[in-house]
């Protein structure tokens, strides 16, 4: 019998076994990596250097997932979490890690993905940009709602690896001005007796509570997300909220009737005040709706934008196309440096908001086009000099990548919150020698989590 077969049949290599191991690294999901019986074991809530006692909870032939039972010897990278439910809540993965070590680990994530998946061995990599704040940085929070067995309205985030809610009254990574709203609004919902949606029974109304703040203006927007209209006395309660909180600019009701995990529905109704909150970003004014996309860490996004502008070295004569534009967060600042800008966005509300933002800032050289990148990009009458890509986590669709190769814009700026899909797409764009990477810049948009933002500039290779 071979050695590997001996390990496979070892009484310890099975679900429920309790073993000791040492964490030697982190994967891109933020889990600790250890080894037992020459096989990889992934353990959440751990740090490189930890010596642990763990229970194997999911066992495969070559790897296992484990639950932390006891820290036998803590890593020097450990720190006390700022959140009292950090060990339960699934919102943050790295509350227990020293912030400087988080930064180093995120830089390594980028390197590992580009080397392992992309095959890039020589990278023009800049030092990772740290977030201006490691706590209190989030300008938006959307909480699932539930009701306890005693009737208490709960709001929070799901437990790690489950769909069970962890009730919270404050969250250290969100803007502190939202915490008071969270606590008081939960009480008001409870006092009103509004029904809470039950996912198992597919009954009830209120599903989520969404809070957004313009961190530079202080304006806030409150949105209730419900399966149905008809919350009793909603207008009265909305008026009370506006009177109680001077910085609260509006209350909205979003309708999401589908029995799925989608958070926002297609219909949003303004109940009181304005349906937007205003924010300052890159010396511009932005209006943000209940469900329009905007980077949740304004300070870090501004840092990355500044470095991107420097690296692109725009001369003023370019046509720039922003292929996943949102409300124009990056489109509008960059438009001031080019001849013409085109913003492609699939969300119609974001298109309208982007057009409004251009008008507010008197930026006349931007056109917002509604539709998917797959359908709109091939119809453009002029090939862009600069193409900006900031796709969802899944990356660019294959047809988008093929269209980029067909058009061959001179420069591509690709921004991603998912290094593995970024590396995959870069590998495709550079595979035939059409493009070369000239600049790689990571930025910490999401402190206390394992997520990292990365921007890459590609330049067309002549011939």
From Swiss-Prot:
Binding site for [4Fe-4S] cluster: 83, 89, 92, 171
Keyword Ligase part of the UniProt annotation: no
Annotated EC: 2.1.1.-
Any one GO molecular-function label of the UniProt entry: rRNA (uridine-C5-)-methyltransferase activity
Top-level taxon of the source organism: Bacteria
Active site: 417
Annotated positions binding S-adenosyl-L-methionine: 295, 324, 345, 390
Enzyme class: transferase
Residues covered by the TRAM domain: 12-70
Keywords: 4Fe-4S, Iron, Iron-sulfur, Metal-binding, Methyltransferase, S-adenosyl-L-methionine, Transferase
GO biological process: rRNA base methylation
Family to which this protein belongs: Belongs to the class I-like SAM-binding methyltransferase superfamily. RNA M5U methyltransferase family.
NCBIfam families attached to this UniProt entry: rumA
Protein name from the UniProt record: Uncharacterized RNA methyltransferase sll1967
Species the sequence originates in: Synechocystis sp. (strain ATCC 27184 / PCC 6803 / Kazusa)
Organism placement in taxonomy: Bacteria, Bacillati, Cyanobacteriota, Cyanophyceae, Synechococcales
